[in-house]
Amino acid sequence: MNSTEFPLLDRTTQNSVISTTLNDLSNWSRLSSLWPLLYGTSCCFIEFASLIGSRFDFDRYGLVPRSSPRQADLILTAGTVTMKMAPSLVRLYEQMPEPKYVIAMGACTITGGMFSTDSYSTVRGVDKLIPVDVYLPGCPPKPEAVIDAITKLRKKVSREIYQDRIGSQQENRCFTTNHKFHIERSTHTGNYGQGLLYQSPSTSEIPSETFFKYKSSVSSHELMN
């Protein structure tokens, strides 16, 4: 803005009134203050790490990485999520204050990737655990794609209504799809599953009263046969 534009700006702002709603003001203030919690478990997270450098400079979007979920309003999941990691991911999401958003980055996070076909311990999509706002496919996605996903999330934030978002989250909660597994007793206890096998009692384990009672009840005709 040069010096010739200042008088025009003064004339327009002296008699101008900006009218807005509290919801729009809240959305506008959050557009450039997204604080992400980085949840990376695989190679996709390396592509996100390149955004921190000077070439892409993701600080210009107001992104400030946080190490605590209580200080973050955006969680970016990248990589494979296993069954053992699922409770930790849900716990991190629940500790984030409202409003909060999720970006699923990479094929392994969205669908389980190549590990979902033969693996029994891979979660087939992070949206089965937490609600996802933006899906970012790729193996791995490029840094430009991550910037595009953040731009789309900012557009979604600018148009959303807070009450509608709370209502949709209560209707579409996490754990929508159950993984069908049958829990059985573990046989790797050092006993080689002996508790699961039937063992006939030996003669020494039978009480003497039972043995002589059975012997006296047998007739001589049965003994001859």
Swiss-Prot record:
Topology versus the membrane: Peripheral membrane protein
Entry EC number(s): 7.1.1.-
InterPro entries: NADH_UbQ_OxRdtase-like_20kDa (IPR006137), NADH_UQ_OxRdtase_20Kd_su (IPR006138)
PROSITE patterns: COMPLEX1_20K
Cofactor binding note from Swiss-Prot or TrEMBL: Binds 1 [4Fe-4S] cluster.
CC cofactor: [4Fe-4S] cluster
Binding residues annotated for [4Fe-4S] cluster, in chain numbering: C43, C44, C108, C139
Top EC group: translocase
Catalyses which reaction(s): a plastoquinone + NADH + (n+1) H(+)(in) = a plastoquinol + NAD(+) + n H(+)(out); a plastoquinone + NADPH + (n+1) H(+)(in) = a plastoquinol + NADP(+) + n H(+)(out)
Entry GO CC: chloroplast thylakoid membrane; respiratory chain complex I
Biological process annotations from GO: aerobic respiration; electron transport coupled proton transport; photosynthesis, light reaction
Cellular compartment(s): Plastid, Chloroplast thylakoid membrane
GO MF term set: 4 iron, 4 sulfur cluster binding; iron ion binding; NADH dehydrogenase (ubiquinone) activity; quinone binding
Keywords assigned: 4Fe-4S, Chloroplast, Iron, Iron-sulfur, Membrane, Metal-binding, NAD, NADP, Plastid, Plastoquinone, Quinone, Thylakoid, Translocase, Transport
PANTHER family to which the protein is assigned, alphabetical: NADH DEHYDROGENASE (PTHR11995), NADH DEHYDROGENASE [UBIQUINONE] IRON-SULFUR PROTEIN 7, MITOCHONDRIAL (PTHR11995:SF14)
Protein purpose: NDH shuttles electrons from NAD(P)H:plastoquinone, via FMN and iron-sulfur (Fe-S) centers, to quinones in the photosynthetic chain and possibly in a chloroplast respiratory chain. The immediate electron acceptor for the enzyme in this species is believed to be plastoquinone. Couples the redox reaction to proton translocation, and thus conserves the redox energy in a proton gradient.
Subunit architecture: NDH is composed of at least 16 different subunits, 5 of which are encoded in the nucleus.
Listed name of the protein: NAD(P)H-quinone oxidoreductase subunit K, chloroplastic
Species the sequence originates in: Calycanthus floridus var. glaucus (Eastern sweetshrub)
Gene that encodes it: ndhK
